[in-house]
Amino acid sequence: MASVSQAVRSLFLKEFVNAFFLSMRYFFKQKATVNYPFEKGPVSPRFRGEHALRRYPNGEERCIACKLCEAICPAQAITIEAGPRRNDGTRRTVRYDIDMVKCIYCGFCQEACPVDAIVEGPNFEFSTESREELYFDKAKLLANGDRWEREIARNLAQDAPYR
């Protein structure tokens, strides 16, 4: 009896028809993926991407060389050298380096910063061809901040009620 049932199923190609209808059902549904890099999905305001140093609206850099980000970094990826105190009593960094090879994108540096100087921006497309390009110095970090400032400020404003 089992062989007759199997012969009938194979004669009418039941498995093929079931598979075909299953494929057609998914063919007409909305796609679950995007055609990256031509389309990009939504990015959360809390996304932790490429690091950036921010400036005040008058152009002065925000970092006050408190070194809290360097102290809290679990990967020890941040190196800061502070310059001498200025006449008004504030300090600024002479050297601010981040080794992105070591960085684990935990966001502790951003949370520790009292003036929101170091942030993890919205950029997730920063592939490189050499390892040396992943050592960010102060100039590169400030350039990232200048490039992404509008989006960074918007993301921080959206996240402000939860901080």
Curated annotation (Swiss-Prot):
Gene Ontology molecular function, alphabetical: 4 iron, 4 sulfur cluster binding; iron ion binding; NADH:ubiquinone reductase (non-electrogenic) activity; quinone binding
Annotated localization: Cell inner membrane
GO-annotated cellular components: plasma membrane
Topology within the bilayer: Peripheral membrane protein
Cofactor annotation remark: Binds 2 [4Fe-4S] clusters per subunit.
Annotated ranges, domain 4Fe-4S ferredoxin-type: 53-83, 94-123
Enzyme class: translocase
Signal sequence coordinates: none
Similarity-based family: Belongs to the complex I 23 kDa subunit family.
Its job: NDH-1 shuttles electrons from NADH, via FMN and iron-sulfur (Fe-S) centers, to quinones in the respiratory chain. The immediate electron acceptor for the enzyme in this species is believed to be ubiquinone. Couples the redox reaction to proton translocation (for every two electrons transferred, four hydrogen ions are translocated across the cytoplasmic membrane), and thus conserves the redox energy in a proton gradient.
Protein name as annotated: NADH-quinone oxidoreductase subunit I
Organism annotation: Allorhizobium ampelinum (strain ATCC BAA-846 / DSM 112012 / S4) (Agrobacterium vitis (strain S4))
Gene: nuoI
